[in-house]
């Protein structure tokens, strides 16, 4: 990243020097006094346009088009991952699809719920998610697979700009293998766990009640049960609460999963979320362990892999998506030691 940025800056400075030399010492008749002000402004604008035309300063930029037809057919850079006051109005077909995900009966009015929600939590996109003009944002998406055990990936994971985790994943006691840093943690009410003070909670709402739960959990604590008991109160700073856009869930389902499963898992939602906000993405803790077992790294689960047979998510198809992304050099997958 630094080498590529340095190359751009060197090119820019060299261009200024050569232009200045030509204007001051040739017989063009252009006054040298004109150069410092007007020419610098034009050069600065041209350089800004040049940099803006580059997806990033990484060696491989995820959003670079015309690298893979398969990727270009699925990736829509105009899709906004987070719900805000500016994009909260959903198309009717998207809204009806979302309501069917968990067959919610008599849902509250979504518009009223969103208005109440954004009186409590930020209504604008997390400024950290806005990509810089020049740079390379490296992100680690840490899954919950048992293949993280004894991997010693911890320091490598922590070296990324963003570290995304999901659901009930703990770090305390597992730092050597999974790292200790978390910048964004994706959860839904039934999978919530206490988060660190500076961690951004990204709520993935599968029903209107999930949005109401955020309101309740940060105020009155009246919602204690959905289809299972949920925490009545949470210790998360309101400015650290972000909402995954329901329309983005449908985008993942339509464009990436092409209708496989009932709806996307938190894992694939985290991955597609990351390729929209990051320039480089590394996956850790996805897939089975070396013995072919599917279980969480923090537990010895006698029924490992049972979740793959529920029919809610198509785990095999989702895993094929991740391996294809890796095969075309859009992401990297670290499968454990």
UniProtKB/Swiss-Prot annotation:
PTM notes: The soluble form derives from the membrane form by proteolytic processing.
Keywords linked to the UniProt accession: Disulfide bond, Glycoprotein, Glycosyltransferase, Golgi apparatus, Lipid metabolism, Membrane, Secreted, Signal-anchor, Transferase, Transmembrane, Transmembrane helix
Entries under Pfam families matching the protein: Glyco_transf_29 (PF00777)
GO biological process, one term: protein sialylation
Cystine pairs: 56-61, 58-136, 139-278
Gene inactivation effect: Knockout mice are deficient in CD8-positive T cells due to increased apoptosis. This is associated with a reduction of naive to memory T cells ratio in blood and peripheral lymphoid organs.
Compartments reported by the entry: Golgi apparatus, Golgi stack membrane; Golgi apparatus, trans-Golgi network membrane; Secreted
Lumenal side: 26-337
Stated name of the protein: CMP-N-acetylneuraminate-beta-galactosamide-alpha-2,3-sialyltransferase 1
Source species: Mus musculus (Mouse)
């Amino acid at each position: 990243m630094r080498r590529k940025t340095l190359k751009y800056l060197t090119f820019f400075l060299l261009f200024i020097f050569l232009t200045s030399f030509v204007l001051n010492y040739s017989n063009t008749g252009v006054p040298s006094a004109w150069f410092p002000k007007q020419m610098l402004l034009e050069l600065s604008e041209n350089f800004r346009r040049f940099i803006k035309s580059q997806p990033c300063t990484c060696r491989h930029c995820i959003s670079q088009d015309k690298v893979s037809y398969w990727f270009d057919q699925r990736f829509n850079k105009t899709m906004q991952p987070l719900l805000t006051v500016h994009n909260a109005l959903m198309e009717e077909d998207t809204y009806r699809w979302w309501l069917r995900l968990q067959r919610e009966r008599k849902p509250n009015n979504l518009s009223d719920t969103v208005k109440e929600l954004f009186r409590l939590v930020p209504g604008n996109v997390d400024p950290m998610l806005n990509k810089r003009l020049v740079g390379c944002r490296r992100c680690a998406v840490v899954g919950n697979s048992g293949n993280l055990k004894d991997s010693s990936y911890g320091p490598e994971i922590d070296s990324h700009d963003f570290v995304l985790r999901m659901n009930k994943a703990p770090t305390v006691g597992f730092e050597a293998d999974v790292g200790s840093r978390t910048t964004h943690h994706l959860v839904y009410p039934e999978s919530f766990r206490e988060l660190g003070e500076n961690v951004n909670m990204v709520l993935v709402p599968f029903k209107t009640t999930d949005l109401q739960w955020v309101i309740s959990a940060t105020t009155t604590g009246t919602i204690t049960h959905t289809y299972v008991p949920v925490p009545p109160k949470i210790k998360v700073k309101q400015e650290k609460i972000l909402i995954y856009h329901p329309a983005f869930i449908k985008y993942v389902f339509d464009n990436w999963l092409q209708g496989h499963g009932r709806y996307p898992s938190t894992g694939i939602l985290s991955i597609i979320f990351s390729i929209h906000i990051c320039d480089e993405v590394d996956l850790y803790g996805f897939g089975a362990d070396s013995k072919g077992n599917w279980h969480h790294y923090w537990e010895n689960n006698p029924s490992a892999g049972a979740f793959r047979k529920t029919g809610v998510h198509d785990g095999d198809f989702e895993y094929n998506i991740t391996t294809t992304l890796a095969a075309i050099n859009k992401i990297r997958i670290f499968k454990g030691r």
